[in-house]
């Protein structure tokens, strides 16, 4: 189980390195982690089993499940093929797997029957421990007239914390039959419960310019629904989506894009899901064009990871001290929320000299490309 950050105070961290040539240097915090061009957060809503049987092994590497006829008369499986994984790099020679989020209803997570269509608790835990985000989607996915929205929000937080030991801090409004404006009640109650973001019907995005500070602190954002047409595989519809992403890559500003679907197996569950062949084509195309195999400008990361990076970026202050070839960079972050899971930052170093790290007050691993492109340092705040 990954342990969450528990500090809630100003954090001062030092990174010291030595230049190989005497030159003047400067440094700034990258707009996006690893200095990528586009952050793409893709969420699988409702906690369907295909997140673990299909999406996870495709992205992380492993055997994708063969067809699994399930209790909904659908199919929670894929093509049964072995995947080597889909990756981008951290800009310093290390590869990072594509990761998604699951919007979870804890009240409908179960281990039986064998042909279940939903995730089990052990599967949710595995996804979380592999760096996927688990988002609050309400305890029972209720939206109809008479729903106690506050109870739905809080019960889901409490039950997931009880079962797995972490606190969900991102909310996704559940869809379905509803009263007009019900989403605003969910938004209000989610923020009151400590959520930092809410995915709703209307808000920022789905493509958000993050070249400037992210405002407001409590972010309501919209997402694109990606779904197949009935049970007919159409790769041309995925090509249209890829063209949309390509246009975002051409933006002069860094972009954070949010999209979602439901099931990712072999059947189009509720006609609001993405058939596995289309899901696979989308993800492998992203890898080949914008991941490690392509131009490596894509940060394929889930909502919480991206939001927390942007928060850290907007609240961090850096100072640089240089004495000849010796450089010290101090990074200060005040009032780091105790529920933050990710405290990573990327520094863009403007230097005409290669460099090597000498010392750091950070307890986490630091990566840099000081001996090659000499322009990036990745680290996490204590």
Feature roles, as predicted:
Residues 75-80, 227-250:
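A Trp-anchored, charged/polar loop motif used as the substrate-binding/catalytic surface
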Residues 1-7:
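C-terminal segment of classical bacterial N-terminal signal peptides
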Residues 114-115, 141-239, 278, 311:
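Catalytic domains of cell-wall/extracellular-matrix polysaccharide-remodeling enzymes
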Residues 367-382:
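C-terminal beta-strand-rich structural cap/linker in extracellular carbohydrate-active enzymes
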Residues 39-43, 99-104, 133-138, 167-173, ...:
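Structural recognition of the beta-strand scaffold that forms the well-ordered cores
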Residues 13-32, 194-211, 256-339, 343-370:
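C-terminal domain-boundary segment and adjacent tail
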Residues 46-50, 106-111, 134, 139-144, ...:
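Solvent-exposed loop/turn segments at secondary-structure junctions
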Residues 14-130, 159-178, 335:
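Active-site beta->alpha N-cap acidic-glycine motif
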């Amino acid at each position: 189980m990954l342990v969450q950050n528990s500090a809630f105070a100003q954090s001062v961290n030092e990174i010291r390195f030595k230049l190989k040539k005497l030159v003047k240097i400067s440094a700034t915090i990258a707009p996006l982690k690893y200095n990528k061009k586009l952050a793409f957060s893709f969420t699988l809503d409702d906690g369907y089993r295909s997140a673990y049987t299909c999406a996870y092994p495709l992205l992380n590497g492993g055997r994708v499940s063969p067809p699994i006829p399930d209790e909904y008369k659908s199919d929670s499986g894929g093509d049964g093929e072995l995947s080597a994984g889909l990756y981008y790099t951290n800009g310093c020679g290390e590869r990072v797997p594509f990761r998604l989020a699951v919007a979870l209803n804890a009240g409908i997570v179960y281990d039986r029957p064998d042909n279940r269509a939903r995730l089990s608790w052990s599967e949710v835990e595995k996804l979380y421990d592999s760096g996927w985000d688990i988002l609050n989607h309400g305890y029972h996915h209720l939206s109809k007239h008479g729903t106690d929205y506050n109870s739905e929000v809080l019960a889901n937080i409490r039950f997931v914390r009880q079962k797995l030991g972490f606190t969900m801090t991102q909310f996704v409004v559940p869809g379905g039959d509803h009263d007009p404006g019900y989403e605003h009640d969910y938004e209000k109650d989610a923020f009151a419960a400590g959520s930092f973001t809410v995915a709703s019907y209307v808000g920022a995005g789905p493509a958000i310019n993050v070249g400037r500070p992210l405002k407001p602190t409590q972010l309501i954002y919209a997402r694109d629904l990606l779904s197949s047409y009935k049970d007919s595989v159409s790769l041309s519809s995925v090509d249209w989506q890829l063209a949309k992403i390509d246009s975002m890559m051409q933006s002069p500003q860094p972009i954070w894009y949010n999209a979602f679907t439901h099931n990712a197996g072999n059947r189009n569950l509720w006609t609001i899901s993405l058939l596995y062949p289309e899901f696979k084509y989308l993800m492998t195309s992203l890898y080949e064009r914008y991941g490690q195999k392509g131009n490596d400008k894509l940060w394929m990361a889930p909502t919480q990871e991206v939001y927390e990076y942007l928060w850290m970026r907007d609240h961090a202050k850096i100072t640089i001290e240089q004495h000849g070839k010796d450089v010290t960079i101090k990074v200060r972050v005040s009032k780091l929320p105790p529920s933050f899971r990710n405290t990573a930052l990327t520094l863009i170093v403007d230097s005409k000299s290669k460099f090597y790290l000498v010392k750091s007050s950070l307890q986490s691993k630091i990566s840099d490309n000081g001996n090659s492109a000499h322009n990036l340092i990745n680290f996490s705040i204590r």
